[in-house]
């Protein structure tokens, strides 16, 4: 038995969003107590600040494996050009907070370089870095859960994380990753707060290993103020 062929195209349904599928499967999430409540973000300005600098792991003649250990802290002063006149800051805002930081390692060594190695980066949020050294006999970040390896010296490497402000060097805790409760810091005219951080350990080589490091900082500002000088410098 044969059926007559349809002479029209079936109407396709509108594609459903993934969020809609989740809510249909879990209707209790629609309850006002659990659903996402949109909040006004008036007066908050999102910016992206970047800087690039060179970094060199110096050559060594020692043939036993060793690692050059270093650290990276982030300060908004390094990303903002200096102000002029009586206004010491070039950004007319009163408060800021750093949402995210992206660190990119761009290798610059020649491809004909014969030595190879394996380095590490680890996210350190409590300012408890391993002491800086040029020839440590082991990789100090090898057992860190946040460790990512760097095939040296030709591979591109990047890290993306939420830095934490160093508000008190005598304490060993940091603020949680919560957007609603993240602290707003005052944009100072003299020196701003350091944020931590990224620990690095590069395996030494008989050649110099050159990198261009590009740091991109995602910052939020609030309380726009054009008064010169600021209200409370």
Curated annotation (Swiss-Prot):
Pfam families: Circo_capsid (PF02443). Its main location: host cell. It comes from the Viruses. Keywords: Capsid protein, Clathrin- and caveolin-independent endocytosis of virus by host, DNA-binding, Host nucleus, Host-virus interaction, T=1 icosahedral capsid protein, Viral attachment to host cell, Viral penetration into host cytoplasm, Viral penetration into host nucleus, Virion, Virus endocytosis by host, Virus entry into host cell. Changing residue 63 to T: In strain: Isolate PCV/688. Changing residue 134 to N: In strain: Isolate PCV/688. Changing residue 206 to K: In strain: Isolate PCV/688. Residues 5-41 are annotated as: Nuclear localization signals. GO terms for molecular function: DNA binding. Residues 1-47 are annotated as: DNA-binding. It is found in: Host nucleus; Virion. Homomultimer. Assembles in the nucleus, presumably in an immature form, then migrates to the cytoplasm once assembled as mature virion. Interacts with Rep; this interaction relocates Rep into the nucleus. Self-assembles to form the virion icosahedral capsid with a T=1 symmetry. This very small capsid (17 - 22 nm in diameter) allows the virus to be very stable in the environment and resistant to some disinfectants, including detergents. Essential for the initial attachment to heparan sulfate moieties and chondroitin sulfate B of the host cell surface proteoglycans. After attachment, the virus is internalized in a clathrin-, caveolae- and dynamin-independent, actin and Rho-GTPase-mediated pathway and traffics to the nucleus. This is Capsid protein.
């Amino acid at each position: 038995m044969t059926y007559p062929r349809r002479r029209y195209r079936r109407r396709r349904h509108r594609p459903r969003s993934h969020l809609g599928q989740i809510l249909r499967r879990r209707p209790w999430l629609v309850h006002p107590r659990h659903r996402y409540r949109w909040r006004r973000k008036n007066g908050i300005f999102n910016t992206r600040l970047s800087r690039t600098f060179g970094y060199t792991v110096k050559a060594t003649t020692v043939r036993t494996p060793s690692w050059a250990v270093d650290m990276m802290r982030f300060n908004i002063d390094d990303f903002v050009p200096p102000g002029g006149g009586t206004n010491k800051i070039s950004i007319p805002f009163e408060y800021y907070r750093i949402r995210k930081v992206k660190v990119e390692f761009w290798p610059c060594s020649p491809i004909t370089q014969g030595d190879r190695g394996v380095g590490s980066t680890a996210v350190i949020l409590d300012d408890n870095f391993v002491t800086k050294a040029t020839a440590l006999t082991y990789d100090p970040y090898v057992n860190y859960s946040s460790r990512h390896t760097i095939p040296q010296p030709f591979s591109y490497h990047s890290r993306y994380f939420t830095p934490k402000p160093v508000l008190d060097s005598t304490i060993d805790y940091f603020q949680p990753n919560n957007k609603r409760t993240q602290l707003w810091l005052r944009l100072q005219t003299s020196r701003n707060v350091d944020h931590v951080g990224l620990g690095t350990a590069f395996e030494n080589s008989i050649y110099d290993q050159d990198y261009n490091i590009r740091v991109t900082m995602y910052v939020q500002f609030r309380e726009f103020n054009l008064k010169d000088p600021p209200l409370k410098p």
